[in-house]
């Protein structure tokens, strides 16, 4: 077990950025392996859910290769890990109360002491993520075109560039591609790719060590700043304040800022209006879920990278049944390859059906009101219980109305039946919600995009 985890950790450390590895993989702990089932523990629910959605496929693939057989990887919650991994606080530094992140995850902020290292090493850019390796389709062609324009003219075109969309659609790939091209054109340029969570940690570290002068000196001196998943800034006032200063300094100096988020800027919960207005001052582009032809192209390209041949029929079958995002396609491909190698079979549609039977059964499930409520709640980051509660703040009322609209559009339920499933509400309340969201969809591109993403997710 220990040998496996060392192998798995080493592999992931090579593939991920230092921030990703430190934030998501390092806190995990392998528990046991028995009868083809591997159990891995996470210290809290947030990390557990994130690891399951982002890294489960890769860990499963590494495990299958290590044991030379299909492995069922299960992630479990073990809060004891959080307390076990907290460092002892130095007597000379008092613990700091912060609503940003706990002090136990602090990492050193970058300093000028590392300026002798190569620019690419400091940038945290993944060299594998380039424009050449990015599969383009209707869903992302505008985002790619904007990214290329920015890469060719950093600081003068679309500043800031704000890319938003669901998980696994290629936003991170695009911003790394920009960084790679800018570095290729000018190796001396000062670039930093950073996940929003790591930026939060840098702010806390500066606060703890009274090092905001060094913090500002570093971030304000960049030529290109790439911030991934900025929705993590929501509700963190000191982080937002410092980022606002950095934003203003970089824009004034005609330096380029590129930002990604899982949602449209105005929909980010807990984000300062000043920042939202700054985000809107540049170019905001949606990255949509890939269409069928694009999904096929992605599968065929990934298969070539894995050194296997995928027939068009097999690629179309997989792409037709798995529609949500690129990461899901990559995970499915790994499962197919592991199954094919273990059983010594060529990759046919029948083999794919066997390898992906669990995934396909989930995709083929009927849409229910309960599933709509859960999907919408996850999308807007609220509790499912809020769907049938009496709460009426805007951040709850609107998602509830959207869920009612989707229930009317995607199920056979009557208005009274839908109302009953939303906390016993009257059918006129449901009718009002349906009409309101339908009207908003016709007038607002943002609303139409939200509904499109939700419908694609629900239909699988």
From Swiss-Prot:
Organism: Janthinobacterium sp. (strain Marseille) (Minibacterium massiliensis)
Region (Domain IV, binds dsDNA): 341-460
Domain remark text: Domain I is involved in oligomerization and binding regulators, domain II is flexibile and of varying length in different bacteria, domain III forms the AAA+ region, while domain IV binds dsDNA.
Region (Domain I, interacts with DnaA modulators): 1-78
Coiled coil: none
Family: Belongs to the DnaA family.
Binding site for ATP: 168, 170-172
A GO cellular-component term linked to this record: cytoplasm
GO molecular-function terms, A-Z: ATP binding; ATP hydrolysis activity; DNA replication origin binding; lipid binding
Name the UniProt record assigns to this protein: Chromosomal replication initiator protein DnaA
CDD domains in the record: AAA, Bac_DnaA_C
Keywords linked to the UniProt accession: ATP-binding, Cytoplasm, DNA replication, DNA-binding, Lipid-binding, Nucleotide-binding
Main function: Plays an essential role in the initiation and regulation of chromosomal replication. ATP-DnaA binds to the origin of replication (oriC) to initiate formation of the DNA replication initiation complex once per cell cycle. Binds the DnaA box (a 9 base pair repeat at the origin) and separates the double-stranded (ds)DNA. Forms a right-handed helical filament on oriC DNA; dsDNA binds to the exterior of the filament while single-stranded (ss)DNA is stabiized in the filament's interior.
